Design a protein with these regions (language model features):
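C-terminal membrane module of polytopic membrane proteins
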Residues: 218, 224-257
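Hydrophobic, membrane-inserted alpha-helices
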Residues: 97-102, 179-182, 203-210
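Short, intrinsically disordered terminal tails adjacent to the first/last structured region
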Residues: 2, 8-31, 247-257
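Membrane-interface loops
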Residues: 63-77, 107-191, 195, 243-257
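Active-site His/Glu-centered metal-binding helix of metallohydrolases
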Residues: 93, 175, 219, 223
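Interfacial helix-loop-helix junctions of multi-pass membrane proteins
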Residues: 146, 165-168, 206-232
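Aromatic-anchored segments of alpha-helical transmembrane domains
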Residues: 56-58, 125-131, 202-212
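N-terminal transmembrane-helix/juxtamembrane module of multi-pass inner/ER membrane proteins
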Residues: 21-99, 147, 156, 255-257
Length: 257
């Protein structure tokens, strides 16, 4: 409530009120600025989020080329795999799965584990963008009609409307699912829990199968995604290549000292 002196003019009252609002607004901005600075100071590794400004514009640009000619990805196995709409559940869980592992490592994991996960993800995703740019690809596997009508087929229809059948090689759903499971399995807390590790494995396999049973990917896309993930796993976790230079630099500094 605004209290005022009867002797004051309305304009003076309004000016004082506006001044209070301005000071309050500046205080809020200052507090928000302090909170942001504190956040980035505590989580210095948050700079990796900038990758979104590379990936998303590039990906949406590729999706905008869906009407251009592309190489059709197809193998004989694709024709033998039936359409099963129930796989929409694990397929959609992929988004939460990959994000949940990311957030866990960001807030609770070691920086090394977080960087390993990001290197795994971002390297494969960048290669996917490059391949899709120089080798436009897609498939013709989607059914034109569904034998059944239920909530799952409705969800699949919505998925088909939102996602074009292009830019599919290698499968990022497959690649990122494997990356998430490997990161979770290597986490000293989550990886020691058999229930969590086992559930993660089942979800990973379900997502991989979903890409084919929903006719979102050819078996060739899946094979390429698995191969790329296997190579990245060897590079990131087996040889620890991503941090070998860091160890060498640290050893050199200790030698100099």
């Amino acid at each position: 409530m605004l209290y005022c002196d009867p002797d004051q003019k309305p304009t003076e009252i309004m000016m004082k009120h506006e001044m209070k609002l301005l000071l309050s607004h500046r205080y809020c901005i200052k507090k928000e600025d302090e909170i942001m600075k504190a956040f980035f100071h505590k989580y210095k590794h948050s700079f990796v989020l900038l990758y979104a400004f590379i990936y998303l514009p590039w990906f949406f640009w590729l999706e905008s080329r869906a009407n251009l000619p592309y190489h059709v990805i197809h193998v004989g196995l694709d024709d033998k795999i039936p359409f099963v709409e129930y796989f929409i559940v694990p397929y959609l869980l992929w988004f939460a799965y990959v994000a949940a592992v990311f957030l866990w490592l960001f807030f609770r994991g070691t920086k090394k584990a977080f960087y390993q996960y990001c290197i795994f993800l971002f390297t494969g995703m960048t290669l996917f963008l490059i391949i899709s740019t120089v080798f436009p690809n897609g498939h013709l596997l989607r059914p034109t009609s569904f034998e059944r009508h239920n909530i799952f087929t409705v969800a699949v229809q919505l998925l088909y409307q939102a996602d074009t059948p292009t830019n599919i090689f290698p499968s990022i759903h497959v690649f990122n699912s494997i990356a998430a499971h490997r990161a979770l399995s290597n986490d000293p807390k989550l990886g020691q829990n058999r229930l969590i590790r086992g559930g993660s494995f089942v979800l990973m396999v379900s997502i991989i199968l979903a890409t084919m049973f929903l006719k979102q990917h050819s078996a060739l896309d899946v094979a390429a995604g698995i191969l790329l993930a296997t190579l990245m796993d060897q590079l990131v976790y087996r040889t620890d290549f991503a941090f070998s230079r860091e160890r060498v630099s640290k050893r050199n500094r200790e030698t100099v000292i």
